[in-house]
Amino acid sequence: MRIIARLLTVVTQSAFLLVFFMTNAHAVITVTDEYGEHSFEQAPQRVVALNWDILEQVLALNVEPIAAPNLPGYRQWVVNPTAPESIEDIGTRAEPNLEKIASLKPDVILAASPQQDLIPLLKQIAPVIYLPNFSENEAAAETAIRHFRTLGKLFNKEALAEQKLTQLDTSFEQMRQRIRHYYSEPLSVLVMRFSTPNTVFLATENSTTDYVARKLGLHAPIKEAPRAWGVKQDRINRLQNLQNSYVLYVQPFPEERKLKDSPLWQAMPFVKKQRVNSVRAVWAYGGAMSLQYTAEAITDSLIELAPKQ
């Protein structure tokens, strides 16, 4: 009887192990992009990121890609997270070096709208996940957050992705409270960029800038309908009626000295009231974590301006 009992135990354990291994053998990672579902037997290890927003997203998830385009440009304009020197540079975002990409033998290629026409060729090298953003029909911030979750799933980093998104929401509220310490709500603030001393880029309602401003409790005195890339170019005289608003302009702007010497600029109501300040350089076309960098820069600029009130 003991022998039979032992045999039954062994058979039961063997059956359990067989089911366990069969289940895990078929456990796949499935993610969805603009073209549908894609399945992977395991989290990709050799990753090529073809756009800066995607590069930022994967680095924020502690995934180091093997290659990305125009890394000097990324380090100048995007900055955070830092792109390690070990990442191979594969040319430009619009025309990445396909031969070099193929030689690196990636497990997955992450692409965005600048590479859409290359997808048939890229698919011959490795599976492609297509994550476009910044079209007229995209709410850019929400799309960046959705892509962050998609990449978290792809790389088995879902818990980290959710942790960082929770921290993002918490930081928005903390920064909003910091601003309220110095200013009463509602606070009218225009966050913009300069093209020339006479031309400005205004953030549209689908831009990351507008999303961040709303999260901080700021009200835009000029509202623009959604557009591709989240900006509308306009003449500087569009700002001449901002009597009770604050104006923040994002760096860099090489002609800043020329602007400040301009009689037209000096005549602006917000300039006369010392309600204008610069914002340190932040990237408006990044991933989910760029929203936090933008919020921090806007908050710091407003607080720097507060003692003058």
List each language-model region with its residue ranges.
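N-terminal signal peptide c-region/cleavage motif recognized by signal peptidases
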Residues: F20-N24
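A short, structured surface patch at a secondary-structure boundary
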Residues: R46, W52-K100
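Alpha-helical, coiled-coil/dimerization segments enriched in small aliphatic residues
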Residues: P72-W77, L202-V231
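Proline-aspartate-enriched helix->loop->beta-strand connector
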Residues: K105-A111, P127, L239, N244-S245
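Extracytoplasmic substrate-binding proteins
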Residues: L121-S195, A284, M289-Q309
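Structured C-terminal subdomain patch of bacterial secreted/periplasmic proteins
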Residues: R146, L242-Q309
